[in-house]
A protein has these predicted regions:
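Alpha-helical scaffolding within the catalytic cores
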Residues: 1-6, 54, 58-61, 87-92, ...
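N-terminal binding-site loop/beta-alpha segment at the start of enzyme catalytic domains
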Residues: 1-70, 189, 273
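Acidic (Asp/Glu)-rich catalytic clusters
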Residues: 8-9, 37, 57-67, 89-98, ...
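Short, acidic/polar
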Residues: 24-37, 80-96, 117, 142-145, ...
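Acidic-and-aromatic substrate-binding clefts and catalytic sites of carbohydrate-active enzymes
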Residues: 24-27, 47-55, 77-83, 110-113, ...
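A structural motif
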Residues: 41, 97-100, 131, 155
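Glycine/small-residue-rich loop that forms an oxyanion/phosphate-binding "nest" at active or ligand-binding sites
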Residues: 75-123
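Beta/alpha (TIM)-barrel catalytic core signal, keyed to glycine-rich beta->alpha loops juxtaposed to Asp/Glu
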Residues: 108-273
Length: 273
């Protein structure tokens, strides 16, 4: 499987496609990640709060692949924003790794106002070589502006909810203007967008599945995606998106599905710790 890479603003390269393990039970995670790695996946996205870092690490070890061929992302949970070094140390122990490729602040949790402190912690972790790149997740424009008012280090990545029903045009453009790569979590809208009539019509016409059409829409927007997959068949289907392109008309039609509809929490109000 040949997956394009994107060069981040720190010079590191990230595969534009991978596997996400959000809400994947630990007992299933190792098997799914191992299968994905054996079938060409080279980018795994996990997080401390997912509770499956240890299984991700076991699958990586089991794969026998060179460490530098696998891009591993994990995330700093909200209650550890003032203690990022210890939090990453715990994640690395579970993963069985001496560094991750990308470490993200999972949410800004604005009520607690500690994300700038967390960012300075991530800067130090990058300097120490414990993470190759650093970034944020679920940050809106005002969170990014505040961060850059108080730091000279621009996040390499902003991972946000993006799917056809929540296309996030303004935020993606804002990220791009700052040199920040956009990653999409829930790129299929937790599968709700798969039943959209516009997407189904395009899929039927070009002989692809709705999931493949949506994932290809992300790829052509230069967005990084890592859809969750619940079966080997779905893993293969999701990855089979690099031998076709959507026309400009099809891209515009999918853009038109946008309704500002979230399937996840709003970063303005999400403060769970």
């Amino acid at each position: 499987m040949s997956v394009p890479t994107i060069t981040l603003n720190d010079g590191n390269r990230i595969p534009q496609f991978g596997l996400g393990v959000f809400l994947m039970p630990p007992q299933e995670t190792q098997e799914h990640v191992a299968f994905a790695l054996a079938n060409g996946y080279r980018h795994i996205d996990t997080a401390a709060i997912y509770g499956n870092e240890r299984e991700v690490g076991a699958a990586i070890a089991e794969s026998g692949l060179p460490r530098d061929e696998i891009f591993v992302t994990t995330k700093l949970w909200n209650n550890r924003q003032t203690d990022a070094p210890a939090a990453l140390a715990e994640s690395l122990e579970k993963l069985g790794l001496d560094h991750v490729d990308l470490y993200l602040i999972h949410w800004p949790t604005p009520r607690f106002d500690t994300y700038v402190q967390a960012w300075h912690g991530l800067e130090r972790l990058q300097t120490e070589g414990l993470t190759r790149s650093i970034g944020v997740s679920n940050f809106h424009q005002q969170h990014l502006r505040r961060l850059l008012d108080e730091s000279d280090v621009v996040p390499a990545v902003n991972q946000i909810e993006v799917h056809p029903s929540l296309a996030q045009f303004e935020l993606v453009d804002f990220n791009t203007g700052l040199g920040i790569a956009t990653e999409a979590w829930s790129p299929l809208g937790r599968r709700a967008d798969l039943s959209n009539e516009v997407i189904i019509a395009i899929a039927d016409r070009i002989g692809r599945t709705p999931a493949q059409v949506i994932l290809r829409w992300h790829i052509q927007r230069d967005i990084i995606v890592f859809p969750k997959a619940s079966s080997p068949e779905r893993l293969r289907e999701n990855a089979d998106i690099f031998d076709f392109e959507l026309s400009a008309d099809d891209m515009r039609a999918i853009d038109g599905v946008d309704a500002g509809t979230r399937v996840g929490s709003n970063p303005e109000t999400f403060n769970r710790r």
